[in-house]
């Protein structure tokens, strides 16, 4: 798995591969690793699929409950979502295997949090996780810069995740890109044949 998130000048960009593995076997080629919590908050997940999907599902239901209970039109903050996940992981770290990136746009503007397995939620301008992230650390250090537009960030993230899928056997498949702005959010799937590094070995 390779997941990535960054704050842009006009929103938040999230990206992830779509390969799920069982040991060394590819179990799913097109798994969705970016879950919509609200129209303006999304969560990237890496780790045990059952744990991460259960966490994302619980968070979405909890946020829906808060929205109904508060009976207001105010946006749930990205920070609240990150703190909910942090608390669950902290209290259940012996049973859950998950690392998550929470990103979105709320009343405070673009926000991004890395939620660690230990139950720590850290605000970030850029975050990457999963087994594939270790292969692209230097690439991201060199080419990521703060203040990129969402389109520039999309190009950067697409290349970075593509690099990870080539080197990491546990990452691969279509690359899932989610662009989040104050007004809207947009999801795009980039198939292997359309990815920047057109190597035949990763096109299957």
Residue ranges and their predicted role:
Residues 1-204:
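Long, low-complexity N-terminal extensions
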